[in-house]
Structures are given as structure tokens and as C-alpha cells.
Design a protein with these regions (language model features):
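Conserved N-terminal catalytic core of the sugar/cofactor nucleotidyltransferase
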Residues: 1-19
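Short beta-strand-to-loop acidic/aromatic patch adjacent to the donor-nucleotide binding site
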Residues: 19-29
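Conserved alpha/beta core of the MobA/IspD/sugar-nucleotide pyrophosphorylase nucleotidyltransferase superfamily
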Residues: 86-173, 179-183
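Short, acidic Gly/Pro/Ser/Thr-rich loop/turn segments
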Residues: 55, 79, 100-102, 146, ...
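N-terminal "arm"/small-domain region of PLP-dependent enzymes with the aminotransferase-like
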Residues: 163-214
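Conserved N-terminal alpha-helix of the aminotransferase class I/II PLP-enzyme fold
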Residues: 197-237
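Conserved core of the sugar-phosphate nucleotidyltransferase
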Residues: 31-115
Length: 237
């Protein structure tokens, strides 16, 4: 039988109810300041979150204007159309003893019995956010460094972000892949600031499904179109 991290917490349910708890996943690398950030915040039940960026994967959340977490977004329910509203869970949580005892552990036990142990602990939090009285808030990061390492590529990126001696050389080795570092500004990259124009981008987006799904035009059609665009007479020889 396969198990997931919900089972790990289920095994620790008695200890969870004895005191306030910091829950940290083991595949993270992050600045020490994140500990101070979450511990010094007076709110008792917090999840560190980061505004969505293209490299992020896994569980997302939505926040209201008071930073209450109002929904957990799984991979199955993720929609690219809604990414402006998404925050990624950093997977560092602070839970009070009362929250664990009165809310999380009871739902954890019920969820595990109903759906089994091959689930994620965030699913329990998602159920709790559906209650009228939400006790869990998101605490957005403000530029602090962190990364989730799931494979060798993630490890290489994380080593680049946190490098102390040879960071420039590591970045330069990734030339052509700077888009994986959304906050990086490359002032040496030769680009045409006027291309592509906004209207062209909008036209490509509007026709993306056709461009992706249909066969490309053959040489005959492409030659005809190019001749038309450049006002050239097409030779019939």
C-alpha cells in the first residue's frame, strides 16, 4: 500500500496536539529569515506563501483581502487563466495547539479513514477552509529566497540562487534559460524592444488552439503568402 505525507502527520497526531508546531517539508532550501518571519507574526495559524511564478508547481492557494486562505488549488483544479490570483504554498506552516487539537487533527483522522493514506496533508487544510470560520491565513513573502527541490534540475537552479562565491558564473552557464529566474534582469541580452508588438502577441494567443492542433501549411501556401506580403509576383514556371 502506498502512503503519502498525510500518513506521516497521522502517525504524529498525538504529538501535534501537545504544543504549537512548525511544519516544514524536507525538500526546501530557504533563507533563515523565513523562520523569523513566521514566528514573529502574531497570528497563530499561518502558511508562508509566494505570488505565483512560472517555475512553481504543486499546491496553490487563494487569499482574500485580509489574507485569509479561502481555497487550496490542487494540480487537478489548477487553471492558467486564474494565475494572477494564485499564491504558491512555500510548505512552511505555523499551527497553534488549539487549531491542531480542535480543527486539524479531527479532520485529519476523518479524512484518512474516508479516503485512505495516499493523500496530501494540504487536502485536510482545504476542507477546513471550506468552513464558515476560517482560522488559517497566508503570509506572503517579500522577495526572500526559497526553492523546492524535486529533481536534479531543481537542485541546479537552487544552487545557483543560493551560491555565495560563483553565482555569476552559474547564471552565465544557464544562458538561454534566464526565464527560469523571473526576478533576474539581463542588461546584456540582445533583444528588439519593438518585437513582437502587442497586437501580434494578442493574435497568437487568440489563435493558439488552431496553431497547436492543426497541420502547418505546405510550401506552396507559404510561398504564396510570402509573395503576397512582399508584393512579389509568384512565378508559375
Amino acid at each position: 500500500n502506498k502512503t503519502n505525507n498525510i500518513y506521516s502527520l497521522y502517525l504524529a497526531k498525538e504529538e501535534l496536539q501537545k504544543q504549537d508546531t512548525l511544519l516544514i517539508e524536507s525538500d526546501l532550501i530557504f533563507e533563515d529569515t523565513l523562520f523569523h518571519k513566521i514566528l514573529n507574526n502574531p497570528y497563530p495559524n499561518l502558511a508562508l506563501v509566494a505570488k505565483y511564478e512560472p517555475w512553481m508547481d504543486g499546491t496553490m492557494v487563494r487569499l482574500n483581502t485580509e489574507n485569509d486562505i479561502i481555497d487550496f488549488i490542487s494540480k487537478k483544479t489548477f487553471r492558467y487563466a486564474d494565475i494572477d490570483d494564485y499564491y504558491k504554498t512555500v510548505n512552511i506552516y505555523k499551527f497553534s495547539k488549539e487549531f491542531l487539537r480542535n480543527s486539524y487533527v479531527p479532520f485529519l483522522e476523518a479524512y484518512s479513514k474516508a479516503l485512505g493514506n495516499n493523500e496530501y496533508y494540504e487536502q485536510v487544510l482545504r476542507v477546513i477552509t471550506l468552513l464558515e470560520r476560517c482560522e488559517l491565513k497566508g503570509l506572503p513573502l517579500e522577495g526572500e529566497r526559497w526553492y523546492e527541490i524535486d529533481d536534479i534540475q531543481d537542485l541546479d537552479i537552487a544552487e545557483t540562487i543560493f551560491a555565495e562565491q560563483d553565482q555569476l558564473q552559474r547564471y552565465q552557464k544557464r544562458y538561454g534559460g534566464y526565464w527560469r529566474f523571473p526576478k533576474l534582469k539581463d542588461f546584456c541580452y540582445l533583444v528588439n524592444p519593438y518585437f513582437p508588438p502587442q497586437k501580434m502577441c494578442e493574435e497568437l494567443q487568440a489563435n493558439f488552439n488552431v496553431l497547436l492542433r492543426e497541420y502547418p501549411s505546405g510550401m506552396g501556401v507559404n510561398t504564396l503568402v510570402m509573395a503576397k506580403n512582399f508584393a512579389q509576383k509568384l512565378s508559375t514556371a
